[in-house]
Amino acid sequence: MTDWSAVLTGFVVILVLGLVGLVVPGIGQLAAGLLGGLVAGYLAGGGLARGFWHGLLAGAFGGILLGAILFVLLTVAGFLVGPIGGVFGGLAGTSAFVIAVTLAAIAAIDSAVGGAVGGLLA
């Protein structure tokens, strides 16, 4: 079972450290992802795999939200055009969601590694 409080806490850590990394050189986005994933994995506990999963979700959370929003917008826009537009809007929305989630998961690999370490430390 996913511990969403751990995922959201890790996401907030990534967000805050990412913003700090824009202003203060040396911290960077990679460190933000690693530390946010570490926090998510540590809070979730349960070992390597559970920490990896929670770190991955924390790192990919923004992309997953974007994909869900694109899915809804494209599907609704398609239905506004008509029945055929609804079919194409649904296909476009589903495609956008799958692409966004896939890219978010790839970009969140550093967070997943941090989460695995955090899961081991917990």
Where are these regions (language model features)?
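Juxtamembrane/disordered regions of integral membrane proteins
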Residues: 1-58, 64-122
